Amino acid sequence: MHKLVLKRIKKSRYLYFMIAPVVIWYLVFCYAPMFGLVIAFKEYDIYEGVANSPFIGLLQFRSFFSSIYFWRLIRNTFLISFYGLIFGFPAPIILALLFNELKDGRFKKITQTISYLPHFISTVIIVGMFTTFLAPETGLINNIIDALGGERIYFLSEPKYFRSLYVILDIWRSVGWGSIIYLAALSNVETELYEACVIDGGGYWRQLFHITLPGIAPTVVIMLILRIGQLMTVGYETIILMYSPSTYETGDVISTYVYRVGLIDSNYSFSSAVGMFNSIISMTLLVCANSISKRFGETSLW
C-alpha cells in the first residue's frame, strides 16, 4: 500500500510541484495565524509574548458586547452585506446570461474582457476613480446634476449615501469576474434540450425558465451558500479608502473597527476577540445555509 502511494505521487509529481506553492501559501498565511487566536483570551503584551501574557478568559468579548459601537458595527456590517447579496449576487448571473446570448464571437470576447478588467485594477485606483467621479466641484456626476439644475451633492461625506455607493462600486468591480463561473455552468447545459424546446414551440423565456436556469441551479446554490457565509464579512480595504469620520455612522463595519483598534491603537487582544467573534458568526451562517440547502435540495457543500 505504501509503495502504491509513493508510485502515484511519483507519477503525478509535476502536478504536486505546481500545487505546492498554493498549499504553502495557505498554510503560512491562513492556517498558521490561527494559533494566534489564543491572544483573544489574554491581556497580550508584545514584550511579554503570547505564552507569558496573563490569561483573562472572555473579558475581551464582554468588553466588545458592552461597547457603544457593538450594535452599530453589527447593523452596518449586516446591511452592507445584505444589500450586496440582494443586488450584487444576481448581477453576475444576469451578465452571464446576456453574454451567453451574444452570437458575434469577437464582440463577445471584447465585452467579456472589458467586464473583467476592474477585477485586476488596484483597489486604490478603483476608489480613486470613483472619488473623482463623485467630487463635489469637478466630478462628472455632480457636473451632470448641476447641468440639470440640481444642487451639487457631497456624496462621500453624507452618511445616507455611503452604503449605496459601496454596493455600486463593489458590483461594478466584481460583476464581470463573477460571471465566469456562471458562463462555465451555462456551457455545460446540453444543447439538445434547447433544440427539443424549439421543436415543441418554446420561445426564449420558456427556454430560460425551463432549461437554462434549472441547468445552472446547482452552481447558483453553491455560490449562494458561500455568499451567505460571508454575510457578516465586509472587506475593509475599499471602505477604509472611501469612508471618513463623518460616515462612520453608516460605513463603519467590524473589519474596519478591527483594523483601527488592532493596528492603529495596538490593542491586539481586543481586536483578535472581535475578529474571532466575526469568524464564528460567519461559520455559523455558512453551516446553517448549507444545512438548509441539503435538507430541501440535493446541492450542498458537504
Predicted regions and their residues:
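N-terminal hydrophobic targeting signals that begin at the initiator methionine
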Residues: 1-2
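A structural signal for multi-pass alpha-helical bundles of membrane permease subunits
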Residues: 7-302
